[in-house]
Regions:
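S4-like RNA-binding module at protein N-termini
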Residues: 53-56
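Compositionally biased, intrinsically disordered low-complexity segments
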Residues: 154, 446, 496, 593-595, ...
């Protein structure tokens, strides 16, 4: 009798057989009930509605919308074909969105058909499909089919949308207008329909956006046919974007207009650039110091299980795929090694940037090398084909947990040169950093690694203004991704700018931590040793867990204070490293867990703590209670306040 695994394998073979051309959408009767239920139960298929299924993944988390967003347009096309045959089309508004490379999954998709019943069909994750009954289909020449979707042509959609569309969606309207080679298709529709008012505002719109020759052609043709046409702008004040001088691919216009519309908002919220450092050595030394923290957080944001110990092992050359089978197979070790290799190349470019070379030109020339170094270990290990290092993606990609869908892979080849042109023309380092990071992720040129690449690019651009290397922390992942989503879906760059400013500001304020107070205590209830550092006039509460002392400093079964004192210098270095990166707890304190530490050996002799400088602290970074009682001897949560003369023994 076949085992459960053998039965599942049989069902997967059946599924593979019907997935021709990467098909993701299926009717229930495409598979037998047994295979269908087995694949649904094991997470390989997901039901959309009765009779319809989509491909899914057992790795998808409960409530995750990525499989649905990846299948949305294919589902809508196949569902409408099954129900309406060829008697359906999308609305003119949605047609313009798709022509203009607006790829966000809509909450509601409106489908027009003579066979419709004016019904709002509930789909997955809050999306709906509304079938709107219309009297008849438009002329065949007004429609085009793109990836299975029946759209109005760009010209037909511009004529059919109401004038209010131009105020509500000025970017989409102008992107599509910029893509038209001439006015012939528009004029045919305007003349045949007698649309003199539409001709007037379309002519004015073309004139306002730098296509005066098209505006003149529309006016001459309409007036020659006897129509009284008067120009009037369909846009509101401040809605006109850069003027293209020639027909431009939609994705290129979109990237250019997004940049222009957002750069002022970035400038308004960003601190003034410090300027290139006169002495580049301290700057580069800090980049080296921050690497372990940067690698840990950047890789963790992408879902890799990477510890500081692994990062340190890779940095010290302990990664050995030729002789260590575990390193060849370990996905996390491969990612850490790739990050280390890419980081070295980025650092070389940063050195050129702070020496005064053009940062955008350097990034344009080097970014594919960064990418190849990042994934070279996976190719060496046989987990990726060598061709995966060729460059930009040739497949669609989807973002986990987001309604935003990156541009079609065919558009990436046009988008990236335009992106780097904008980066080179931009005079402000802050704009290069913020919009460079966001738009790189918006285009998503690679099949993987785009987040890490965007953060590398951001830091290279920050260096061009003398801003410090900035770490995006794993603890901020939710707000970080949410801010990116706001920019990509709602075209609101303010949250992302504010987020980056907060991270940059920490280093601009030159926070640093010193350890002048030798007093420490062990809190049995919390299983931690507490001690203090000082940032200027502010005392910062620091702690290391019992687990960290046991795992990394041979503290199991020993007096924790003695173990701490014997390794104090090493522990203080790790605390300072976290503090420099702004990797603090919510209350401003620093806590060292076992996962924060690379492996360390117990030194033979205890390091000597610094002598206390005396005096009570004026402020303590820690809980609100700690700050209000700074220096109080009775605090049971903290160690004895810095400067106290009473020796604290280990509490057991």
């Amino acid at each position: 009798m076949p085992s459960p695994n053998e039965k599942l394998a049989e069902s997967l073979d059946v599924l593979k057989a019907i997935q021709e051309g990467n098909q993701r959408v299926f009717r229930s009767d495409d598979l037998s009930r047994v295979h269908r239920e087995r694949l649904v139960d094991n997470g390989f298929l997901q039901e959309v509605m009765k009779g319809w299924l989509i491909s899914s993944s057992p790795d998808a988390q409960a409530g995750e919308g990525t499989p649905w967003h990846a299948s949305f347009w294919e589902f809508c096309a196949r569902y409408c074909d099954e129900r309406f045959g060829d008697q359906w089309h999308l609305s003119p508004e949605q047609s313009l969105f798709l022509h203009g490379e607006r790829t966000v999954i809509p909450d509601q998709l409106v489908v027009h058909s003579p066979k419709a019943t004016n019904n709002d069909i509930k789909l997955l994750f809050g999306t709906t499909l509304y079938d709107l009954k219309v009297a008849e289909m438009p002329p065949p020449a007004a429609l085009t089919v793109r990836e299975g979707l029946r759209l109005f042509t760009a010209a037909a959609a511009l004529v059919r949308v109401p004038e209010s569309f131009f105020q509500l969606y000025p970017l989409e309207a102008q992107v599509v207008m910029a893509s038209l080679a001439d006015a012939s298709d528009l004029l045919r529709l305007l003349l045949n329909g007698g649309h003199s008012a539409k001709a007037g505002y379309l002519a004015k719109a073309f004139r306002q956006t730098g296509r005066g020759e098209l505006a003149d052609e529309i006016l001459r043709a309409m007036k020659g046919a006897g129509y009284d046409v008067r120009e009037s702008s369909p846009f509101e004040a401040g809605q006109i974007f850069p003027k293209p001088s020639r027909p431009t691919a939609p994705i290129v216009s979109r990237v250019e207009m997004l940049w222009e519309s957002m750069r002022g908002k970035v400038l308004a919220g960003f601190p003034k650039a410090p300027g290139l450092p006169a002495d580049k050595e301290p700057y580069l030394r800090f980049v080296d110091e921050i690497y372990p923290t940067d690698a840990y957080h950047s890789l963790s944001i992408e879902g890799y299980s990477v510890t500081p110990a692994l990062v340190e092992r890779v940095r010290q050359g302990g990664w050995d795929p030729e002789n260590d089978a575990g390193d060849r197979r370990n996905r996390d070790a491969l990612a850490a090694r790739g990050y280390w290799q890419a980081f070295q190349l980025v650092k070389k470019e940063v050195e050129k940037v702070i020496a005064g070379e053009n940062p955008a030109a350097l990034a344009r020339a080097a970014h594919n090398d960064w990418y190849r170094e990042m994934f070279q270990p996976c190719v060496t290990a046989g987990l990726l084909e060598p061709g995966s290092l060729a460059g930009y993606r040739n497949i669609p990609v989807y973002l986990r947990g987001s309604r935003y869908v990156p541009p079609r892979w065919e558009a990436v080849r046009e988008a990236m040169p335009a992106f780097f042109d904008l980066l080179e023309k931009e005079p402000e380092p802050s704009v290069r950093a913020v919009l460079g990071h966001w738009l790189f992720g918006y285009v998503h040129p690679y099949s993987d690694g785009n987040g890490r690449m965007a953060r590398f690019l951001m830091n290279a651009m920050l260096a061009s203004g003398g801003y410090p290397w900035t770490v995006i922390r794993i603890v901020d992942r939710k707000s970080y991704l949410s801010a990116l989503d706001r920019a990509s879906i709602e075209m609101d760059i303010h949250p992302f700018t504010t987020f980056i400013v907060r991270r940059v500001q920490w280093r601009l304020e030159r926070h640093d931590l010193k350890f002048p107070a030798p007093k420490e205590s062990f809190d049995l209830g919390r299983d931690m040793v507490f001690f203090y550092g000082r940032d200027g006039e502010t005392w910062v509460r620091c702690a290391i867990s019992r687990e960290a002392l046991d795992d990394h400093f041979h503290g199991d079964g020993k007096d924790k204070l003695k173990v701490f004192r014997a390794n104090r210098q090493h522990i203080e270095q790790e605390v300072r490293r976290k503090y420099l990166a702004g990797d603090t707890e919510l209350d401003g304190s620093i806590l060292i867990h076992s996962d924060d530490l690379p492996d360390a050996e117990q030194p033979e002799e205890a390091s000597q703590p610094a002598e206390p400088d005396g005096g009570s602290p004026e402020g303590i970074r820690g809980s609100a209670e700690d700050r209000s009682r700074a220096g109080a001897e009775e605090s049971r949560e903290l160690s004895t306040a810095p400067g106290d003369e009473t020796e604290e023994s280990e509490k057991t």
